[in-house]
Amino acid sequence: MSAIDAGARAPENLWRQEIRATLALAWPMVLTNLGQTAMTATDVMMMGRLGPDTLASGALGANLYFMPLIFGLGLMLATSPMIATELGRRRYSVRDLRRTVRQGLWLAILISIPIWIVLWHGEAILLAMGQEPALAHQAGIYLRWLEWAVLPFYGYIVLRSFISALERPGWALIIVFVAVACNALFNWVFMFGNLGFPAMGIAGSGLATSLSSTLMFAGMAAVVMLEKKFRRYRLFGRFWRSDWPRFNGLLRLGLPIAGILAFEVTIFNAAALLMGLIDADSLAAHAIAIQIASISFMVPLGLNQAVTVRVGLAHGAGNPEGVSRAGWTAFVIGVSFMALMGLVMVLWPHLLISAFIDLANPANARVIALAVSFLVFAALFQVFDGAQAVAAGMLRGLHDTKVPMIYAAIGYWGVGLPLGVLLAFHFGFHGVGIWIGLSSGLAVVAALLLTRWLRRDRIAPPLAFGH
């Protein structure tokens, strides 16, 4: 083989290596995300067996629970790019990683305290929002048992970020799937009063989730203390020692991530409320379409987490070519997958819908027709959603979170929601108008994020964005 042939193959081999590394990191994260979704689905199914009132109370409580939980989750996610950059830099990486993880756990404790206070008063908050007293009371009981899941969940996220940055995410997958099984068992025991325990009803579901989250954290803590590759970092050594500059760095990086998640969650909550203003069939069809889209979104979400690590490693090493290669690899994989899923939605909508509703029941005809029409636009929605999710992870690996937060506000609340309202209620597009608005908002966010990535990738070395 000539020197020219060898030189031509070297870049090709680097791209192949990046594809393999990205997929090896992403697929356990995708399955981990699906496992966490399965835990929520288990809770819903178990609550449904206690009756519609219990299910409604659980839904109210869960919505109130997830609002502050998501904000805190954004803060915890800041540990991933910081750890990856420190690993890529290599110098003092053991000490730096230990300090970052420690400050991440400190932050988990501090942010949990106000969340506990809010959730403890869940019933009063729901009553102030005008909810039915009986439902608010049951939701309040549920929240007082559920709130203790917050801290161990955050601790689990910090430790998961650590093992993912070391490119060993398989442990998180194992732990989550054990937790899914335990969560189902705990629900069965405490909700319905089995194995000699009293029947706690909806409170039992909250207890089950708290115990499962504690199990997840305990399992992850055991892994990082006992597994050979992780043990040398001594993550819990000198846990009491502060590092305020690093703590403040986590806040600076994490607050915009929390803002992005808040904008995303609230825009989808608003879309559901708007569908409810149209009619019940539109809301039901929307719930089906969004659930289908949410399942496939687990893939770009896993790629978002993987590309943050891959870009962060190259970023810390001062390797601009590696930054570019890592970002584009994940972006192409993510968008290609979502385009394929969009095609499935367009070609076989009834097959997908049949998993959620009886197609043979004439009473469901209008819901089915609406869901089919929504899935046409959900196909476009998929591509834009995948693009923005992966692009956000690419920029996060460069510690770039403030401007993406502004882009999220512009796309979701400046374009998506107003356009959806205008099309749905002024121009008579109804539910389809809301889906067009959502798709347009995601397209704007994706375009802005990609433009920023292109500019950063071209004009500056990676370390310019690390501090």
UniProtKB/Swiss-Prot annotation:
Its main location: membrane. One of its GO terms (biological process) is monoatomic ion transport. It holds the Pfam family MatE. It is found in: Cell inner membrane. It is a multi-pass membrane protein. The lineage of its organism: Bacteria, Pseudomonadati, Pseudomonadota, Alphaproteobacteria, Hyphomicrobiales. Belongs to the multi antimicrobial extrusion (MATE) (TC 2.A.66.1) family. It comes from the Bacteria. Keywords: Antiport, Cell inner membrane, Cell membrane, Ion transport, Membrane, Transmembrane, Transmembrane helix, Transport. The keyword Glycoprotein does not apply. It comes from Mesorhizobium japonicum (strain LMG 29417 / CECT 9101 / MAFF 303099) (Mesorhizobium loti (strain MAFF 303099)). This is Probable multidrug resistance protein NorM. Multidrug efflux pump. The chain crosses the membrane at residues 23-42, 62-84, 104-126, 141-163, 170-192, 202-224, 250-272, 287-309, 330-352, 367-384, 405-427, 432-454. One of its GO terms (molecular function) is xenobiotic transmembrane transporter activity. GO terms for cellular component: plasma membrane.
